Amino acid sequence: MIPGEYVLKKEPILCNQNKQTIKIRVLNRGDRPVQVGSHFHFFEVNQSLQFHREKAFGMRLNIPAGTAVRFEPGDAKEVEIIPFSGERKVYGLNNVTNGSVEMGKRK
């Protein structure tokens, strides 16, 4: 092994395999760009982003951890969202949920 060397598998790395996905169209109606990170509760994103919010409850972007999607002013794009895993609890963010993301249990 060489210091700093990476030894990677030849098979592709599959993220979020076998997760239920939903595609939604998002429009930035604001005058500033909005960037949303991989694990942000999509239901609670900036209010300048227009989309079917109810569909996004308990969901996050289907993108690799540590990455984000940027929505420029006036731009519309389709994104794929997936359900949170684990205990399915969300705290902080825009202080809307603060607990379980099971449907019907939000503030």
UniProtKB/Swiss-Prot annotation:
Primary subcellular site in the record, as a coarse category: cytoplasm
Pfam families according to UniProt: Urease_beta (PF00699)
CDD domains on file: Urease_beta (cd00407)
GO molecular function: urease activity
InterPro entries: Urease_beta-like, Urease_betasu_sf, Urease_subunit
GO annotation, biological process: urea catabolic process
Name of the top EC class for this enzyme: hydrolase
Methyltransferase recorded as keyword: no
Pathway assignment: Nitrogen metabolism; urea degradation; CO(2) and NH(3) from urea (urease route): step 1/1
Catalytic activity line of the entry: urea + 2 H2O + H(+) = hydrogencarbonate + 2 NH4(+)
GO cellular component: urease complex
Protein name (record): Urease subunit beta
Organism for this UniProt entry: Bacillus sp. (strain TB-90)
